[in-house]
Amino acid sequence: MKDLVKFLKAQSKTSEDFDVIKIGLASPDMIRSWSFGEVKKPETINYRTFKPERDGLFCARIFGPVKDYECLCGKYKRLKHRGVICEKCGVEVTQTKVRRERMGHIELASPVAHIWFLKSLPSRIGLLLDMPLRDIERVLYFEMYIVTEPGMTDLERGQLLTEEQYLDAEDRWQDEFEAKMGAEAIQDLLKGMDLEAECEKLREELQETNSETKRKKITKRLKLLEAFVQSGNKPEWMVMTVLPVLPPDLRPLVPLDGGRFATSDLNDLYRRVINRNNRLKRLLDLIAPDIIVRNEKRMLQESVDALLDNGRRGRAITGSNRRPLKSLADMIKGKQGRFRQNLLGKRVDYSGRSVITVGPYLHLHQCGLPKKMALELFRPFIYAKLESRGYATTIKAAKKMVEREDAIVWDILAEVIREHPILLNRAPTLHRLGIQAFEPILIEGKAIQLHPLVCAAFNADFDGDQMAVHVPLTLEAQLEARALMMSTNNVLSPANGDPIIVPSQDVVLGLYYMTREKVNGKGEGMLLQDPREAEKAYRTGEAELHSRVKVRITEYVKNEAGEFDAKTTLTDTTIGRAILWMIAPKGMPYSLFNQTLGKKAISKLINEAYRRLGLKEAVMFADQIMYTGFAYAARSGSSVGIDDMEIPAKKYEIISAAEEEVAEIQEQFQSGLVTAGERYNKVIDIWAAANERVAKAMMENLSQEEVINREGNPEKQASFNSIFMMADSGARGSAAQIRQLAGMRGLMARPDGSIIETPITANFREGLNVLQYFISTHGARKGLADTALKTANSGYLTRRLVDVAQDLVIVEDDCGTHEGLVMTPLIEGGDEKVPLRELVLGRVAAEDILKPGTEEVLIPRNTLLDEKLCDVLDANSVDSVKVRSVVTCDTDFGVCAKCYGRDLARGHLINQGEAVGVIAAQSIGEPGTQLTMRTFHIGGAASAAAKESSVQVKNTGTVHLMNAKFVTNDESKLVLTSRNTELTITDAFGRTKEHYKVPYGAVLSKGDGQEVTAGETIANWDPHTMPVVSEVSGFVKFVDIIDGLTVTRQTDELTGLSSIVVQDVGERATAGKDLRPTIKLVDANGNDIFLPETDVLAQYFLPGKAIVSLDDGTAVKVGEPLARIPQESVGTKDITGGLPRVADLFEARKPKEPAILAEISGIVSFGKETKGKRRLLITPAEGETYEEMIPKWRQLNVFEGEMVQRGDVISDGAETPHDILRLRGVRAVTEYIVNEVQDVYRLQGVKINDKHIEVIVRQMLRKAVITKAYDSEFLEGEQVEVARVKIVNRQREAEGKPPVEFERELLGITKASLATESFISAASFQETTRVLTEAAVAGKRDELRGLKENVIVGRLIPAGTGFAYHQNRHKHRLVDDVVAKLSEEDEAAIADEFVITADDATQNLATLLNSEIED
C-alpha cells in the first residue's frame, strides 16, 4: 500500500503539472548542469567494433549504455546491477533510452557569440551595446579592436580601432587602457553594462527628445533593457563559453550494409567545432603567434555559427554531396521542422484507407466497412474477446486464429464492431465536417461505402476518391465520436447555419420529376381519398405521376399543449406530390410539398423539418427523401440526347444582324469617326448583346412547350426536355452551360484576360471549326492553371486564418456589455441585397428592441433572436437592430456566449468551450477554392454600365437625403453642393427600400421628405464632367484668368462656341505658376458677395483642365454651373477580385493610392501650392488648424469653405482600413471589412455568416498602442494586447489612478499571428528563429492559453471536451497539495489498515479527493 501511495504521488507529477512554459537564455552554469560530461574528441564510433569511442560524440560514459542494462565492456549485465557504474569502462548500467535525454557539453577555448542574437534582425547584441551590426561583426571576426576599458586615456569605451590605431595607442599610453578583438571583447562589454543605470539614462533621454525617430529608437532599446532586467537574463550569456551537445540518439549514426554509415548532419557540424576547439587549445598552450590564434578563433566562431544556424552568415557549410548541412535551427523551422512535422502533424495509429463508393441503402449514420479492413483495425479488440471467451489461451493463439480467419473470428468481429463508431476523413479536411463518425456495417468487397447525403460535407465524389478510417479506442473517444461527431449530429453547416445534408444530382432530379405537373395528363381531375389511393392509381397505371388531381390531405399541426391535431382538407395537387407526402413527418405543412421541388426548395424542406421537429425527425426525413428521390429518378428515365439541345431558329438572324452592326462600326473607324479603343469596346458590346439575345431565344424555346388541355385549347407548360429539367431542378448544369450547348459560345478571353473581338458563333451541338477550337483552348488551359494556383493560395489563407484565431474560445456566458453593432439591411440601388432578418438571426439583442414610433418593448435586451422573433421584427417593420458582436465583447481572453449568439451548427446559444476562432477560420477558408483568382478587367459592356447618370425609383415611398447640402435653382429644382450624398427611399413603415449615392452637382426634382411614386426619375447628372455650381446669383468676375498664361481658348469646330480651358500648373510658363485662376461672383456694383450666412467669399478656384464657357461679367443665377471639370474616364481599372482580395483585406494591406480622409472636423481651405502638391488646410471650430500636402493629380472631393467631418473622404481612392479605424473607430472598420469580404463571397454565391468574419476582425484588433502610460508598466508607443491594458486599467481604477490611454491598432492576420502572446504558437507559424530569439531575450512566459500551444506540449486542448478537463485540472491542483501534505505516518497508517487492489485504491483516492473539495 505504501508503494501505491508513492506511486499515486509520482503519477500526479506528470506532464499535466505545469501551467506555464518559460523561455530564456541559458547561462554557462546551466549548460554544465544539464551535461553528463565533456565531449573532448571528435571521434564517433570505432569502425571495427562499432562501439562508441570514449570522450567522443557518442561516448557511452557520458551519454549512457548502448544496450539496455549492460555496460560497454560487458562486465555488468541484466537488471540486478541497475544503477552500478562499471569501474572498468565508467558506464552506468541503465536503460538505453537515457541516450535520448542525457546531454554533454564542450568547453570552448574562446568565447563565441550566439549567431541568433547577433544576426537575427534587429540584432539583440547590437541593440544592447548601441552599435551597428557591421561594427560588431568586424570585432567578432577579428578585423578591428574595440576598447573595453579606456582607463585614464582619451579613448571612449566601445570605440573601434584599426590595427595601426591600436599600435599607436599602445605606444602612447602603454597599458593604461585595454582593447581586444573577438567575442571576448564583446563579452567584456556586455558584462560591464549596468542595465539599471542605462534604463534610467534612456528614460531621461525619452523625456527630453522631441524627434519621432529618436523616440522610436530609444523606446526599442529601453524595452530590450527592461526585458533583461525583469527576466533575470544576463547580457553576457548571449556570448557562449560552453556549448551544449545534443543527446546522441537524437543525432543517430546508423551503419548501412557495405560498411558505410548514414549520419545526421549535426554530427559533422559538432565534429567540426570539436576539431577547431581542440586545435585552438593546443595553439594557446604553445603560445602561438597572434595571427594564427586569431584565425583559429575566427574559424571556431564560424563553425559554431554553422552548428546553430547554417547559412545565416556567409556561405552555408556543405556536406559531401554539395547540399548545405542541416543545422539545429533548420531542425525546428519550416514545414518539415519539429513544430509542424512532429508536434502539430503527428500520424495516427489504427487507421486505414480505401476507395469510396456509393451506399444508397445506408442510413445517414452508417457506412459500409470492408470486412478485411475491419478485421485489421479491430485486431486488439478481437484478441481480447477471444481470450475472455476462452477460445484462445494466449495472445499468440488468438493471433493465429485471426490470421486463419476462423469462422468464430467473424462472429466476434461483428460483436466488437456493434455500436463502436469509426471516423471517416477525406483529405483535404477544409472544415470540421471533413471528419465525421459513422457506425460501420460489415460488407464484402474492398471499397468503403459512403452515404450519398454526406458527400456535400466531405466534398466527395465517387470518381476514385479515397477516404481514411480511424478507430476511436478509449471509451471517452468513442463517446465523443458518438455524441459530437456522428454524421446525424452534423446536419447544419457551421459556416451559415443552413442544412448541409442536402440532396443533389439524381435525388433532386427524381423529386423534381415527381412533383412536376402536366397539362391533361392521364387521370387528370380524379378525386382521391388519400395519398395511398393516389399511389395505387399510379401503380396500376390509372393515372400519370404528373396529373393534376384532388386528394384529401391530412396535416398535423401542433397545439398549445404540444400535441398534434389532425386537419384534413381536399387539396388541388398532383399524384406525385401526394405520394411524396406519405414520407413527410408529422408537423410539416403540405404547402411546402405542393410545389415543383428544385434544389433550393428541398433544402428549405429539410431546414424546416429541423427547426420544427428537431434533429431526429429531420435526419429520418432526409433519408426518406433520398430513397424516394433515387427511386423516382430511375422511374423518370431522364437521359440526354443530341436532339434535346434545340437550337433556336432566330439564332442565325441575330448573328447576321450583329455582323452588319460590326461592319458599320468598322467603316466609321476607317473614316476616322471613332477611335480604335471605342471601336473595340463597341464591337464587344454588340457581340455580348447578341449572345444574350440568342441565349434568351434558346431558353424560351427550351423551357416551354405548347400542349392541348382537356378543353381542347392550347396551353403553355414547362417543358419536359431532359436538359432543361436538369438545369431547372438544380441537379446539374446551368443556363450558362446550356447556352454553350445550344446557343452560341460567345466571346472568349486571351491568356492575358483581354477579350478577343471575334466571338465563337457556333455551339457544341453544331461543333467548332479549327479557329474556334484554337481560341477555346486558351480559356480552358488558363482554367486548369488557375485551379492549381488557387488550391495552394486558398490553403495558405486558411492556415493564416486558423493561426490568428486559434486561441479564441467561448469562456464565459455573459460579459455584461451593452456595446454592439447596429444592423441595417444591406440595400444597393433599388434592391435589398441582404434583408435584416438574415443579419440578425441567431444574434443576441444588445438593447431593448422597441416597436417603431412607440416606447413599447418588443424584445428585451440579451434575447437570442431566433426565427420566431425575426418574424416579429418583420411584422413590426423594424429596420435597424443593435446586436451583440464578438468585436465589442468585453471578455479578456476569449469571448462570451451572448456576444457570439447562436451556434450555427446546432441552432441554440453557443456552449462554453466551443472553439469559435477555428470554426470561423475554417468557414472562411473552406470556400476559398471556389473563389476566382483573377483580377477582373472592366472592358466593353461593363465600363458602359459603370456610368450611371440618373436615379429612377422602383418603390413608392418617401425621399430621405443624408449629409446633403443644396441650392434651389430657378426651375425650383435642387442642385446638390455636397459630396457623398446618399439618397434613400423609405416605405410607409419607415423601412429603407432603396439606397443610392448621388454625386455633386446632380439636379434633384424631389426634396427631403417628399413622396415619390414607383418609376419616377428624381435625380439627373452628367456622368462625364463635374460641374462647379454657383451658390449665389451675381455677375462673373475673372481673377488670374489670363489668356495664354493660365488658360487657353478653344473653339469647337462644329458649333463655333468658344470656351476657356484652365492649364495645369506644370504646363504654365514661370510667370503663371503662382497665379490661381478663380471665378468670383460680384453684385451689380462690383462688390464682393458672401455665401449665405457665412463670412466666406463666393469665389471658386478652378483646378487644371476645368472648362469655363461663360464670359467675364455674365450674369449667373443660383444653381447654375460656372465651369465643368472633365472626369477622367475610368478606362479599364482592374478590380482585384476573388481570393487575392480576401487575402488583402485580412492582411490589412494599404492600397497603392489610398483615399485621403479628413483627420479632424472643420472648414476646408487651400494654402500655398508647391510644384506638385497642394496644401489642404482644415480649420476646426476650436483648436489647431490641420494641414496636409496632397499631390495635384489627386481628384479632390471638397471645395474651399466646405465643412467636413472627421473621417470624411477628401480624395477618391480605395479606403485604408487603418485610417477608418483611426478616424471612425472599431465599428466602422468592422463594418468595412465584413462588407468587403462578403461582397467577394456573395459574387460567387457562397453564404458565410458575418459572425465568422467579425471573429477574425476581433483577432486583428487585439493589439493596442499606448498613447499615455503614466506610471504603469507600459512604455508610450509600445504595442500591447488590449486585454492586458484592460486588466491594468481595472487595477488602476481600484487604486484611484488615471487609466492608461491607448489606441486600437489593426494588424494583418500574419502580423497578428506573429505578435500573439504565446511564443510557442508564433514560432510554429512562421519566422521561427526570430520569434524564439525575441522570446528568449525577453524571458517570455507562455500561459498555454491557445489550442496550438497545448497540442504542441501534448495535452488536451482547452476547448470542447478539453475545456472542462482544464477547469477540473485547476480544481485538482488544490487537492494535490492536500495529498502532498500527508505525512509518512499517515501513509504507514493507511498501509496497515488496508490490503487492497490498485483499482480500489484509485476509487478510495477519488472519494478522498472529492471530500477534500467539498470541505
From Swiss-Prot:
Residues where Zn(2+) 2 binds: C815, C889, C896, C899
Pfam families in the record: RNA_pol_Rpb1_1, RNA_pol_Rpb1_2, RNA_pol_Rpb1_3, RNA_pol_Rpb1_4, RNA_pol_Rpb1_5
Q: Name one GO cellular component term.
A: DNA-directed RNA polymerase complex
Q: What does this protein do?
A: DNA-dependent RNA polymerase catalyzes the transcription of DNA into RNA using the four ribonucleoside triphosphates as substrates.
Q: Does the keyword Magnesium apply?
A: yes
Q: What is this protein called?
A: DNA-directed RNA polymerase subunit beta'
Biological processes, Gene Ontology terms: DNA-templated transcription
**PANTHER family reported in the protein's UniProt record:** DNA-DIRECTED RNA POLYMERASE (PTHR19376), DNA-DIRECTED RNA POLYMERASE SUBUNIT BETA (PTHR19376:SF54)
The record's catalysed reaction(s) read: RNA(n) + a ribonucleoside 5'-triphosphate = RNA(n+1) + diphosphate
Q: Has the keyword Magnesium been applied to this entry?
A: yes
Describe, as the record does, how this protein assembles with itself and its partners: The RNAP catalytic core consists of 2 alpha, 1 beta, 1 beta' and 1 omega subunit. When a sigma factor is associated with the core the holoenzyme is formed, which can initiate transcription.
Q: Which organism is it from?
A: Haemophilus influenzae (strain ATCC 51907 / DSM 11121 / KW20 / Rd)
